[in-house]
Amino acid sequence: MTPMRKTNPLMKLINHSFIDLPTPSNISAWWNFGSLLGACLILQITTGLFLAMHYSPDASTAFSSIAHITRDVNYGWIIRYLHANGASMFFICLFLHIGRGLYYGSFLYSETWNIGIILLLATMATAFMGYVLPWGQMSFWGATVITNLLSAIPYIGTDLVQWIWGGYSVDSPTLTRFFTFHFILPFIIAALATLHLLFLHETGSNNPLGITSHSDKITFHPYYTIKDALGLLLFLLSLMTLTLFSPDLLGDPDNYTLANPLNTPPHIKPEWYFLFAYTILRSVPNKLGGVLALLLSILILAMIPILHMSKQQSMMFRPLSQSLYWLLAADLLILTWIGGQPVSYPFTIIGQVASVLYFTTILILMPTISLIENKMLKWA
């Protein structure tokens, strides 16, 4: 008798995606992050839903409603900190997932890659709006500074900023609309993630060797469900350790002070996962130039498939490209570090050098090294 999972229309869909899915037999732990991102999204939607039940999206009550959640709501403190640190874990998994895609050439699956870029942008927008909701000092000034960047757009910039604010400054209307979008975007992200999976299953997963694996595939269950379960266990262990021992490690102390439009914090900075882009933004002296550099720092990912010059998909057997890849990873860490430092010497010059190196590595060095490696293949 045929199992129900192969006959029932709904079960068949789940079966083809998670149970009998043909999967390359040699994919490593770097392929775990897709399922971990799904787990992160479920965690964020669940904790966010419970927080939304007690949150008040109004400038006069938002800060006190967060205090109420933390102090008075049953287990409110852990729900709040799981949500805040869950966002950090989300971005760690996201960056590692993108890093794996770059290293093993997964960007050649263009539909999957492009939906992934849209997912990244949607996640960044959601996280930014979520950071505004506690209505602390860094929430208020972060929202003011980042939304004000749109004023760099010629002719319509100022009107656009005031339209987003719902007035002449960041206030209650801004907070209400940010809360609305912060609530709805995760569901749009979930829909996009389904599309991401749909297109991935059209081509099948990539593998570390970067060669076709049609002749050597195994079922996703039980082999990779067990592997993903181990990854999930380690992820939950890390998240719970962070949440229970150092819940404010990745936050900003200024956000425990009520938003005050008359008092500017000494160093306005976004959450740690945006610091690399923030450094690139402030490394350009011109406002419009900085905004364009900021956009390009993310959208450059869409150019990666065009810049791929190598005859091999993966970097597995390309030591020169590997060296450049790790140089880029180190450069991103430097950019993240500089983003958290004050705008003064020597940090400004380090930030500018790191920003130039970021774009040079991706746009010039990587394609050039790939062409050199192609020549070396002929000599071998």
Curated annotation (Swiss-Prot):
Changing residue 34 to S: In mitochondrial myopathy; sporadic. Changing residue 35 to P: In exercice intolerance; with cardiomyopathy and septo-optic dysplasia. A ubiquinone binds at residue 201. Binds 2 heme b groups non-covalently. The chain crosses the membrane at residues 33-53, 77-98, 113-133, 178-198, 226-246, 288-308, 320-340, 347-367. One of its GO terms (biological process) is response to hypoxia. Gene3D superfamilies: Cytochrome Bc1 Complex, Chain C (1.20.810.10). SUPFAM superfamilies: a domain/subunit of cytochrome bc1 complex (Ubiquinol-cytochrome c reductase) (SSF81648), Transmembrane di-heme cytochromes (SSF81342). Keywords: Cardiomyopathy, Cataract, Deafness, Disease variant, Electron transport, Heme, Iron, Leber hereditary optic neuropathy, Membrane, Metal-binding, Mitochondrion, Mitochondrion inner membrane, Primary mitochondrial disease, Respiratory chain, Transmembrane, Transmembrane helix, Transport, Ubiquinone. Changing residue 251 to S: Risk factor for obesity. Heme b b562 binds at residues 83, 182. It is found in: Mitochondrion inner membrane. One of its GO terms (cellular component) is mitochondrion. GO terms for molecular function: metal ion binding; protein-containing complex binding; ubiquinol-cytochrome-c reductase activity. Its cofactor is heme b. Pfam families: Cytochrom_B_C, Cytochrome_B. The keyword DNA-binding does not apply. It is a multi-pass membrane protein. Component of the ubiquinol-cytochrome c reductase complex (complex III or cytochrome b-c1 complex) that is part of the mitochondrial respiratory chain. The b-c1 complex mediates electron transfer from ubiquinol to cytochrome c. Contributes to the generation of a proton gradient across the mitochondrial membrane that is then used for ATP synthesis. It is linked to Defects in MT-CYB are a rare cause of mitochondrial dysfunction underlying different myopathies. They include mitochondrial encephalomyopathy, hypertrophic cardiomyopathy (HCM), and sporadic mitochondrial myopathy (MM). In mitochondrial myopathy, exercise intolerance is the predominant symptom. Additional features include lactic acidosis, muscle weakness and/or myoglobinuria. Defects in MTCYB are also found in cases of exercise intolerance accompanied by deafness, intellectual disability, retinitis pigmentosa, cataract, growth retardation, epilepsy (multisystem disorder). Cardiomyopathy, infantile histiocytoid: A heart disease characterized by the presence of pale granular foamy histiocyte-like cells within the myocardium. It usually affects children younger than 2 years of age, with a clear predominance of females over males. Infants present with dysrhythmia or cardiac arrest. The clinical course is usually fulminant, sometimes simulating sudden infant death syndrome. Belongs to the cytochrome b family. The cytochrome bc1 complex contains 11 subunits: 3 respiratory subunits (MT-CYB, CYC1 and UQCRFS1), 2 core proteins (UQCRC1 and UQCRC2) and 6 low-molecular weight proteins (UQCRH/QCR6, UQCRB/QCR7, UQCRQ/QCR8, UQCR10/QCR9, UQCR11/QCR10 and a cleavage product of UQCRFS1). This cytochrome bc1 complex then forms a dimer. Heme 1 (or BL or b562) is low-potential and absorbs at about 562 nm, and heme 2 (or BH or b566) is high-potential and absorbs at about 566 nm. This is Cytochrome b. It comes from Homo sapiens.
